[in-house]
Amino acid sequence: MSDSRPSGRQPDQLRPVVIQRGFTRHAEGSVLVCFGETRVLCTASVENRVPGFLRGKGEGWVTAEYGMLPRATHTRSDREAARGKQGGRTLEIQRLIGRSLRACVDRNALGERTITLDCDVLQADGGTRTAAITGAYVALVDAVNVLMKRGDIKRNPILGAVAAVSVGVYRGTPVLDLDYAEDSDCDTDMNVVMNDGGGFIELQGTAEGHAFRRDELDALLGLAEKGVGELLAAQQAALSA
């Protein structure tokens, strides 16, 4: 029933998705992605260098950084730079974003250069990491297209599309794309990263209250597949615009 969710959405319904390319001027790729009221700025920057462990190997690197503006949430948080270090949650999320994007790149075709995806949360209402992955992919494609047009690389290193969505069990019902009201009151929370071939790149699932059953897990994965399919279509529509 739609009235079982605070937003009134159906259990298998995404929030409205907006992917706006070219949001800032200077980066090779720049995307504002919105999952409902969650808004993340994703920029892709190209540098002609690689980490030390890759020097001389002819391979490129894709990495990510993640952060939230101080008032992205209901109350202001200090900037992590002011604290002198990144928090554990930040490190976990940016590593997830980096892993997810590396899964769709032929790093040999990229050559010895690094593409950094900076994902800055402007407004948080749940699902910031999944929105970041979904938007960062589009920014990555735009950056690669710049390299192709400049003749810096000879073949496209993008192997396929990647998108991510959250699913969870909210008041006994498996639901798709949790907002903050659901995420803060759910029994199970899971983030699912998939590619356009239907393969799973990463699954992060935790029982917040009661342990989830196998049938609930299967239902959640089914919802995630549906949601990712719709997000992949939104990415393609944005890239074709």
Swiss-Prot record:
It comes from Stenotrophomonas maltophilia (strain K279a). Gene3D superfamilies: GHMP Kinase, N-terminal domain. Coiled coil: none annotated. Its EC number is 2.7.7.56. It is an enzyme of class 2 (transferase). Keywords: Nucleotidyltransferase, RNA-binding, rRNA processing, Transferase, tRNA processing, tRNA-binding. NCBIfam families: RNasePH. It catalyses: tRNA(n+1) + phosphate = tRNA(n) + a ribonucleoside 5'-diphosphate. Phosphate binds at R89, G127, T128, R129. Phosphorolytic 3'-5' exoribonuclease that plays an important role in tRNA 3'-end maturation. Removes nucleotide residues following the 3'-CCA terminus of tRNAs; can also add nucleotides to the ends of RNA molecules by using nucleoside diphosphates as substrates, but this may not be physiologically important. Probably plays a role in initiation of 16S rRNA degradation (leading to ribosome degradation) during starvation. GO terms for molecular function: 3'-5'-RNA exonuclease activity; tRNA binding; tRNA nucleotidyltransferase activity. The gene is rph. GO terms for biological process: rRNA catabolic process; rRNA processing; tRNA processing. It holds the Pfam family RNase_PH. This is Ribonuclease PH. Belongs to the RNase PH family. Homohexameric ring arranged as a trimer of dimers.
